[in-house]
Amino acid sequence: MSGFHNVGNINMMAQQQMQQNRIKISVRNWQNATMNDLINFISRNARVAVYDAHVEGPLVIGYVNSKAEAESLMKWNGVRFAGSNLKFELLDNNGASAGTSDTISFLRGVLLKRYDPQTKLLNLGALHSDPELIQKGVFSSISTQSKMFPAMMKLASTEKSLIVESVNLADNQLKDISAISTLAQTFPNLKNLCLANNQIFRFRSLEVWKNKFKDLRELLMTNNPITTDKLYRTEMLRLFPKLVVLDNVIVRDEQKLQTVYSLPMKIQQFFFENDALGQSSTDFATNFLNLWDNNREQLLNLYSPQSQFSVSVDSTIPPSTVTDSDQTPAFGYYMSSSRNISKVSSEKSIQQRLSIGQESINSIFKTLPKTKHHLQEQPNEYSMETISYPQINGFVITLHGFFEETGKPELESNKKTGKNNYQKNRRYNHGYNSTSNNKLSKKSFDRTWVIVPMNNSVIIASDLLTVRAYSTGAWKTASIAIAQPPQQQASVLPQVASMNPNITTPPQPQPSVVPGGMSIPGAPQGAMVMAPTLQLPPDVQSRLNPVQLELLNKLHLETKLNAEYTFMLAEQSNWNYEVAIKGFQSSMNGIPREAFVQF
């Protein structure tokens, strides 16, 4: 018995030793395929097994058995995979590149010390005389010196507490901007930049920033040789199209500049070429999404034998600064069907992934996850544009928004891989967690339908679905917090158009019937009797459905808020009565007197 016990101990010690010898690695630029494809690719080509693989943001993290295997894997840096060049890195146990944790912490500390949140100024002036940087040996060699600024900018781009509008780079012995060129990628919306007291002498060295700082208002270049050139002012105006102040001198009329660069119309959540198209498109979208979420087969009668459908995955991860964005999206259920032609290189695959006709379209419908849209409950989370298409006597609807994945597909296309193929790749496929890339989550989407009216119904000639990582809509305006103190509220209110009709919900669909027996419930008939003290602008009232008008009336009578504040309260609560009342009750002490009806 003791012999068996000793053998067990030896095996356990051997396993522990293997665990201790494992090397943690990461892989970048893999998102155009599934993690399973990546692990199999590595095992087939590099002959290295990756264990316990999982996704962390843009990285696949895993382990290899030894340092020798890790070094072997590093030789594959730059290898092409799914249209991108893979990048392998060695990591320590905390996920940071080996030997870099201390440096990252140090540079992060330097950034935070030099940032003023009051003025939103990042002061990177006179870095060569900074005692901390000198002691750390940052300037001990050209190599470390050249890497410092890009590393600082990479850290700054991920540091959410840094909201930078101005950067000072004075007194840094700069002869050109090659060492600081990444500033434009990190802070593209920079408004003020100081490069004074350097040694910049060529316009050509600034060309890399041409049209990069599109909001740069003020530039300070004093005490640089370049300022003595007779073309200096002309070149600076050419490089920076919105520059107003150069070396403390006004060089452009700011009001005229704003007129030139302002759009002829404000960004709108909903745009319809005419009222008729607006009604038709909202009817269609509401009805379509309802059946898409509940019974997709009933949609098939909307497609003709020539109709086309395709799905495309945009695997780009939103910037970390975007509120509520998904930094670890999973697209496993979509990848095998994705027709993103910027990622799919095979002409055969591009053709195969275009579904034509009802049977083919139905097949791909079944491979997509079950969903739930919230167009009616949360209309502010969606944006729609509709334009006519005279060539086919039809129109084009484009809808942006989000959906929740509520269930696995009826048919999982990523399980079509044959048994033999699985066995072939199994040897080097250790540690792959297939569920991580197939998790159900919230997704953003863009969907474009080309609609052709026909025989008192419609036909979908083309249907294109693009799936993206979830992020808030760009059309959404900043919420106005009712709970703000009166003195703060006064400074915010003038910026808000009084119940802007352009940011309201789409009109509620009226009764209509389309192919397949789909019908859209209409709104109650008869005019809503509003409280005499609830005076809504006609253009606003005309865009609200009876349910919303009833909610406004009910909130107005209950809270005694005036029309503007009642509308704001309803909109901020996503037209949910219970949420609105709770919000009102918790914010009563902060609501200004003028927000209430004056009797």
Swiss-Prot record:
Domain (LRRCT) spans 224-262
Pfam family, any one: TAP_C
Please list every transmembrane segment annotated in the UniProt record, as residue ranges.
Answer: none
Record's keyword annotation contains Nucleus: yes
A Gene Ontology molecular function term for this protein is: U5 snRNA binding
The listed outcome for residue 400 to Y is:
Impairs association with the nuclear pores and interaction with MTR2
Query: Where is the segment annotated Disordered?
Result: 408-439
Span of domain NTF2 = 280-467
Predominantly, its location class is nucleus
Q: Which domain of life is it from?
A: Eukaryota
Per-repeat ranges for LRR: 163-184, 189-210
The record places domain TAP-C at 546-599
Record's GO cellular component terms? cytoplasm; nuclear pore; nuclear RNA export factor complex; nucleus
Q: Is Repeat one of the keywords?
A: yes
Modification N-acetylserine, positions: 2
The text of the family note is:
Belongs to the NXF family.
Q: What is the purpose of this protein?
A: Involved in the export of mRNA from the nucleus to the cytoplasm.
| Assembly and interaction partners | Interacts with nucleoporin complex NUP84 and MTR2. Interacts with MIP6.
Q: What else is known?
A: Present with 2830 molecules/cell in log phase SD medium.
Can you name this protein? mRNA export factor MEX67
Organism whose genome encodes this protein = Saccharomyces cerevisiae (strain ATCC 204508 / S288c) (Baker's yeast)
